[in-house]
């Protein structure tokens, strides 16, 4: 009888504010990153941190969504994975960070993508999804180490909301899950949470 090969289940780390700031500072200071790639990474890290979007969902965003977030505090995005609409919200801090990353004048084409291909003149052209995901994840791993991916933003946001005793149904709705059980699987206490919970 053949034995099933055991595989290690690696720890998936969460990205909290500490890791987010580390990513932003590193990218801003890295002179080897081309300006357009730097802009895409900074935008991606910020939007993922505040919304918990998936990278492929982020690539669907247009400048019109950013304008709505800044003016109204919310916007709706159609998610291709679930074929459903997700409402994104922007508080004061998120708006402040968006204003640092987007130049929005009245002449700006609101149909331009948030994440764009640098080699193309039209900012309506997006980057190949697989290429962008690989680029973002390799940069995250380079800065934070193994165990971190773009999905760590999503997990970190859900975990922080759970730690603040926010109702799981509210977290599920905020993050765009159709099932609360999915949201529960994401809640992953940080080392600090575990240390703080020690009773002996």
What are these regions (language model features)?
Residues 60-96:
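Conserved tyrosine-mediated DNA breakage-rejoining catalytic core shared by Y-recombinases
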Residues 27-35, 133-173:
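Short, basic (Lys/Arg/His-rich) helix/loop patches that form interaction surfaces
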Residues 47-60, 164-166, 177:
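A short, glycine-centered helix-capping/turn motif at helix boundaries
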Residues 66-68, 166-185:
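Short, polar N-cap/turn motifs at the start of nucleic acid-interacting alpha helices
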Residues 20, 91-146:
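Active-site/catalytic core of tyrosine-dependent DNA strand-transfer enzymes
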Residues 79-82, 175-200:
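Catalytic-site neighborhood detector that most strongly recognizes the C-terminal catalytic loop/helix
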Residues 4-24, 83-93, 108-111:
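DNA breakage-rejoining catalytic core of tyrosine-based enzymes
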Residues 17-51, 55:
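Basic, Lys/Arg- and aromatic-enriched nucleic-acid-binding interface segment
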